Amino acid sequence: MHFLDDNIQIKIDKFYKKNSLNKNRVIVAFSGGADSTTLLLNLKYYLSNNIIAFYFAHFIRPDNEQNKEIEHVKGFCDLYNIALQIKKCDIDIKSESVRLGVSIEELARKCRYNALENALKENDANYIALAHNENDQIETIIMRFFQGSFLDGLAGIPSVNKNIIRPLLEVSRPEIENFLSLNNIRVFIDSTNSQNLYLRNKVRNNLLPSIEKIFKGYEKCLKRISEFSKEFVNYFEKDEFFPVEKGKYYYSFDLKAFLDFPKYLVFRLIFKILNSEGIVAKISYKALNELFKIEIDRKKNNVLLKTNDFFLEKRHNKINLIFKRDEKFYKPFDFILEVGKWHSLSLGKILLKCLECNAASVSRLKCCSYEFRYKFFKDKLKAKKFFSKFIRCNPIYLMLLALDNRLIGIIDLNTLNLVWSEKSILKKISISLIGGLLKE
């Protein structure tokens, strides 16, 4: 196959060499539109047809338009002798997005990427090729800027991200249109492209024309910002940049270093760790900003941020990011704890350092886990009402303290704080927890 314009071929060759990519089989995300058609034909030529076109039918648009697009895709691949796989979405994206509380765009993207990953494995391919171009990159940077992204966001769409490649990121939309026109190649026009249904369309159709009128050549400036942002991001990727102690279920930071470091670097470090652990978390800047209001000299330990997957805590002179996977290793407990003696739990070794009760001779307490809470109440409803006060605490960390079978205190083993006490009986208590999730 020979094209009248080989400019895109040159850029794809440069892209492959720059990123040291092999020429093994590629799954090409194909919609029949201008960008993916250009990518498909150029990769067919560059990789000697070692490609598979993959079409994902979302069925967000009317069925008749979706079916016409499918027919176009089939006819196109037959014409150019390209292997094609079609996958139809098995959920109703519109109704499911409402149920999940996410945007149609976000859910559609997730379904599409999952299908592409499955196609990659099923066909023993090396890469998934997406047709994002230079203009898509500019739109993305603008959207992320107005959404308050960090440098990682302003770096733009990565050209290579694990097994996903984007060979057209250095190719502009006019270059794509010129390629299609010169070679008389027909494409399918998505009717929603001209409608302002989605954020990208609004940016493309409404915002960019206004920016172009005021800031001529703004694209070059945004490309420069993107390049500088990438350099900073790559520099901050160095492991030694911020000292971190890593355990089985936690990451621990020095409190002073944590607070002295620029907020941006702390935020991206937290997100980087969460991503490495496979945790997708939506945390607001406001919530993260609260972390920096900690008083260094204050001795009190406390939970700073809590989600379903992890929590951030201040403990002594450390900030700890702890994952809730420890619940798999947790075992209920019921034992007698004496002053000055250690006792082993699944959460670590515990020491009762100090105990003062109204009875001077008391030097031991009965300690048990949350599972045994009902033994101290004759009425279950009263028990439920009483323990509803501690709904914000993780139950696996609550240690109940009893004297003569009477509940006199509750300690949160995560923070080592006394969260409740019968003040007429329990005057003072101090414990240590070593090992388990965290090392002291």
UniProtKB/Swiss-Prot annotation:
What Gene3D superfamilies does its record include?
Answer: HUPs (3.40.50.620)
What chemistry does it catalyse, as a reaction equation? cytidine(34) in tRNA(Ile2) + L-lysine + ATP = lysidine(34) in tRNA(Ile2) + AMP + diphosphate + H(+)
For this UniProt record, give its keywords in alphabetical order, as a comma-separated list: ATP-binding, Cytoplasm, Ligase, Nucleotide-binding, tRNA processing
* Known EC number: 6.3.4.19
Q: Name one GO cellular component term.
A: cytoplasm
CDD domains documented for this protein: TilS_N
Cellular location(s): Cytoplasm
Spell out the molecular function terms from Gene Ontology: ATP binding; tRNA(Ile)-lysidine synthase activity
Q: Tell me one Pfam family matched here.
A: ATP_bind_3
Membrane-crossing segments per the record: none
Classify the main location: cytoplasm
Q: Where does ATP bind?
A: 31-36
InterPro entries assigned: Rossmann-like_a/b/a_fold, TilS/TtcA_N, tRNA_Ile_lys_synt, tRNA_Ile_lys_synt_N
State the top-level EC class: ligase
Q: What is recorded about the protein's domains?
A: The N-terminal region contains the highly conserved SGGXDS motif, predicted to be a P-loop motif involved in ATP binding.
Chain's role: Ligates lysine onto the cytidine present at position 34 of the AUA codon-specific tRNA(Ile) that contains the anticodon CAU, in an ATP-dependent manner. Cytidine is converted to lysidine, thus changing the amino acid specificity of the tRNA from methionine to isoleucine.
PANTHER family, alphabetized: TRNA(ILE)-LYSIDINE SYNTHASE-RELATED
Q: Which family does it belong to?
A: Belongs to the tRNA(Ile)-lysidine synthase family.
> Which protein are we looking at?
tRNA(Ile)-lysidine synthase
Q: Which organism is it from?
A: Borreliella afzelii (strain PKo) (Borrelia afzelii)
Please name the gene that encodes this protein.
tilS
